[in-house]
């Protein structure tokens, strides 16, 4: 998606350890015009798959997921990383490792919001090692829900995440695919 690539080039920053900082439009400050365009792009890609719910992880996946949900007219469910007083039992859970934060988190979704009747689109902000998406797939499996597709905002194609997700047989679509972050230069793969 050319618009997203332009945002990444103009406002993204490469940090040591192959980390791409995109807090100017996605991870801290959110650009709603970009989010709407991304939501529409995800909807266009997945509109014929009978999606009934979108599932993501808090917090940076929420904005693109909500705009995709708006475009598809379906609810959005986000997995929580921290338990709250209102989210204590009757949960589907999985443990995921964060590449950026270098820590594991238990993620949870209330059993009330995912069922065997759901056809899910998973949306996540980044695909690096694939752990967040795999955790969401595990939660969907616990619920007995069908995962029809995985939408990624920014994929680091030089890491193993895409390969792991491809092994699931579930279609994966990334809006921006990064080939390299070497020498603080952002190089993209061609669009899918």
From Swiss-Prot:
<dbReference type="InterPro" id="IPR000836">
    <property type="entry name" value="PRibTrfase_dom"/>
</dbReference>
<dbReference type="Pfam" id="PF00156">
    <property type="entry name" value="Pribosyltran"/>
</dbReference>
<dbReference type="GO" id="GO:0046110">
    <property type="term" value="P:xanthine metabolic process"/>
</dbReference>
<feature type="binding site">
    <location>
        <begin position="128"/>
        <end position="132"/>
    </location>
    <ligand>
        <name>5-phospho-alpha-D-ribose 1-diphosphate</name>
    </ligand>
</feature>
<comment type="subunit">
    <text>Homodimer.</text>
</comment>
<protein>
    <recommendedName>
        <fullName>Xanthine phosphoribosyltransferase</fullName>
        <ecNumber>2.4.2.22</ecNumber>
    </recommendedName>
</protein>
<feature type="binding site">
    <location>
        <position position="20"/>
    </location>
    <ligand>
        <name>xanthine</name>
    </ligand>
</feature>
<feature type="binding site">
    <location>
        <position position="27"/>
    </location>
    <ligand>
        <name>xanthine</name>
    </ligand>
</feature>
<dbReference type="InterPro" id="IPR050118">
    <property type="entry name" value="Pur/Pyrimidine_PRTase"/>
</dbReference>
<comment type="function">
    <text>Converts the preformed base xanthine, a product of nucleic acid breakdown, to xanthosine 5'-monophosphate (XMP), so it can be reused for RNA or DNA synthesis.</text>
</comment>
<dbReference type="InterPro" id="IPR029057">
    <property type="entry name" value="PRTase-like"/>
</dbReference>
<comment type="pathway">
    <text>Purine metabolism; XMP biosynthesis via salvage pathway; XMP from xanthine: step 1/1.</text>
</comment>
<dbReference type="InterPro" id="IPR010079">
    <property type="entry name" value="Xanthine_PRibTrfase"/>
</dbReference>
<keyword id="KW-0660">Purine salvage</keyword>
<keyword id="KW-0808">Transferase</keyword>
<dbReference type="GO" id="GO:0005737">
    <property type="term" value="C:cytoplasm"/>
</dbReference>
<feature type="binding site">
    <location>
        <position position="156"/>
    </location>
    <ligand>
        <name>xanthine</name>
    </ligand>
</feature>
<dbReference type="GO" id="GO:0006166">
    <property type="term" value="P:purine ribonucleoside salvage"/>
</dbReference>
<keyword id="KW-0963">Cytoplasm</keyword>
<comment type="similarity">
    <text>Belongs to the purine/pyrimidine phosphoribosyltransferase family. Xpt subfamily.</text>
</comment>
<keyword id="KW-0328">Glycosyltransferase</keyword>
<dbReference type="GO" id="GO:0032265">
    <property type="term" value="P:XMP salvage"/>
</dbReference>
<dbReference type="GO" id="GO:0000310">
    <property type="term" value="F:xanthine phosphoribosyltransferase activity"/>
</dbReference>
